[in-house]
Amino acid sequence: MRVTAPRTLLLLLSAALALTETWAGSHSMRYFDTAVSRPGRGEPRFITVGYVDDTQFVRFDSDAASPRMEPRAPWIEQEGPEYWDRETQTSKAQAQTDRENLRIALRYYNQSEAGSHTIQRMFGCDVGPDGRLLRGYSQSAYDGKDYIALNEDLSSWTAADTAAQITQRKWEAAREAEQLRAYLEGTCVEWLRRYLENGRETLQRADTPKTHVTHHPISDHEATLRCWALGFYPAEITLTWQRDGEDQTQDTELVETRPAGDGTFQKWAAVVVPSGEEERYTCHVQHEGLPKPLTLRWEPSSQSTIPIVGIVAGLAVLAVVVIGAVVTAVICRRKSSGGKGGSYSQAASSDSAQGSDVSLTA
């Protein structure tokens, strides 16, 4: 669930902000809010999505025919009507707050009302294997650039520019960090524990990665060795290449972990090697689903085009998923507004899992 945090300053998260990874054995809950203005086409659109670890579990879209917080995972559907009513009202309040925030931001940055602008925010908490808070965070952005962020001490702010410094001063005067910290250490952790228990079969599972190495000639003198890990969960994984036992980190091309479209993830790491020296290179894979790290080599006799076909198909699905996720995430971070003074603020409510409203009121 998300709780509404007290009113003061907080806004804007970078459009490129991605889900951050947690430590092994830890779990996270995050909400991503986005408000986008669209002059001449009605009120700004507001979307929020909630994630537990790498699984989306709720979503709200102000453009829906009947805007409500909606379930996105089977295990959250067991929550009763009061939960959905409360989360819906929290999201609607945040949507209204962010609409005001967008207007205030125009004044902060001396911008015209003719253009489209975006406010984004990510906030949430991580807990360790013992269920205790490891880290809390709240980061905001405006038009894809950092705006203001809660520091790791959960008691101070880092402002990215002079406009954000206005917000920082107002939040400090209102002791906004204290209220947000209370949410992160209390409500956020409590709801995360509840979700982990209710969704334990999904959220606390460990799907073992399917691994193999492929060989791709570049010229008569060089070839690319690519180490694949497919179908794993959770998303945290380590792929490294070694040459004669020495890490090749600087020479490794490593892609970001990607959703496969079926609730699992994919990743690969590649190195360019001299032809004829392939046997000197080993790929090392570490993942929660493995009893011990794997060591792989390219086996010339075992290479097949079948895995590649499967990967291409998976990446095709991935493309659709990523596009949808980007649209959602870039249209899904949560801010709240209120008032005309020109100061961002958050509003906290005691029993909503969402965490905090952000608004620019004086």
UniProtKB/Swiss-Prot annotation:
GO biological process: antigen processing and presentation of endogenous peptide antigen via MHC class I via ER pathway, TAP-independent; antigen processing and presentation of endogenous peptide antigen via MHC class Ib; immune response; positive regulation of T cell mediated cytotoxicity
Residue numbers spanned by region Alpha-2: 115-206
Region (Alpha-1): 25-114
Keyword Phosphoprotein set for record: yes
Protein's cellular compartments: Membrane
Cytoplasmic side: 333-362
SS bond list: 125-188, 227-283
UniProt feature, compositional bias: Low complexity: 343-362
Positions annotated with a glycan in the UniProt record: 110
UniProt topology in membrane: Single-pass type I membrane protein
InterPro entries: Ig-like_dom, Ig-like_dom_sf, Ig-like_fold, Ig/MHC_CS, Ig_C1-set, MHC_class-I_related, MHC_I-like_Ag-recog, MHC_I-like_Ag-recog_sf
Region (Alpha-3): 207-298
Keyword field: Disulfide bond, Glycoprotein, Immunity, Membrane, MHC I, Phosphoprotein, Signal, Transmembrane, Transmembrane helix
Region called Disordered, residue ranges: 335-362
Alphabetized Gene3D superfamilies for the sequence: Immunoglobulins, MHC class I-like antigen recognition-like
Extracellular side: 25-308
GO molecular function per UniProt: peptide antigen binding; signaling receptor binding
Pfam families the record matches: C1-set, MHC_I, MHC_I_C
Role played: Involved in the presentation of foreign antigens to the immune system.
Subunit structure: Heterodimer of an alpha chain and a beta chain (beta-2-microglobulin).
Protein name: Class I histocompatibility antigen, Gogo-B*0101 alpha chain
Species annotation: Gorilla gorilla gorilla (Western lowland gorilla)
